[in-house]
């Protein structure tokens, strides 16, 4: 499956949290990426996440929040197996994800340090003992 953030989510992306910007990494994860990745997981299909296409690129926090939450909810092993992040314009984004986001969020997952949400979201998928479960996993909205 192919998903281009600028084509399939928003031409303009924001920063990390919903409270501070529209089309944030938090929004992208909860409105799109979690569901699309779950679909790929159930079909054992690769998700090709295209970063190229927009005028302004991304803030590192947008990518960290959205892809980091994916690691937290599906494990680093599963994300590395099923997600291919593509950018011919800015290979730096891919290096940032692989070198910083992946290990940081896998550590958070292993230590149980939940992500923060800055607005309420509907239910989303998370792997529990290898089985996807859909529910609202975080109910406390953060002030940050």
Residue spans for each PLM region:
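A cross-taxonomic marker for long C-terminal extensions/tails that follow the last structured domain
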Residues: 95, 99-144
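Active-site cores of enzymes that catalyze phosphoryl transfer or operate on phosphate-rich substrates
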Residues: 2
């Amino acid at each position: 499956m192919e998903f281009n953030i600028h084509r399939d989510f928003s031409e303009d992306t924001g920063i990390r949290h919903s409270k501070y910007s529209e089309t944030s990494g938090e929004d992208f994860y909860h409105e799109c990426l979690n569901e699309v990745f779950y679909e790929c997981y159930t079909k054992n299909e690769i998700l090709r996440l295209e970063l190229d296409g927009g005028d302004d690129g991304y803030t590192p926090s947008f990518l960290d929040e959205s892809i980091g939450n994916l690691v937290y909810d599906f494990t680093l092993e599963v994300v590395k197996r099923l997600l291919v992040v593509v950018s011919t314009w800015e290979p730096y984004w891919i290096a940032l994800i692989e070198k910083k986001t992946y290990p940081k969020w896998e550590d958070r997952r292993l230590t149980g340090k939940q992500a923060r949400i800055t607005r309420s979201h509907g239910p989303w998928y998370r792997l529990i003992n290898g089985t996807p479960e859909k529910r609202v996993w975080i109910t406390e909205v953060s002030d940050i």
